[in-house]
Regions:
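Short, mixed-charge low-complexity intrinsically disordered segments
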Residues: 10, 14-15, 31-45
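Short aromatic-glycine-(Arg/Gly/Cys) micro-motifs in beta-strand/loop hairpins
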Residues: 1-16, 25
Length: 45
């Protein structure tokens, strides 16, 4: 299964904003603050 994790840049450690099963949901959250957030795709078993 593929999941998308949205991170937000922080001072010392990047924070996880959320983990999503659908890419569209992750992109929606990312667009709220596109300069401060990024998405990573991960395969989980």
């Amino acid at each position: 299964m593929t999941v998308w994790i949205v991170f937000e840049y922080a001072d010392f450690i990047n924070e996880i904003i959320g983990v999503y099963k659908e890419k569209e949901q992750a992109e929606k959250v990312h667009k709220e603050f596109p300069k401060w957030r990024y998405i990573e795709e991960h395969e989980v078993q």
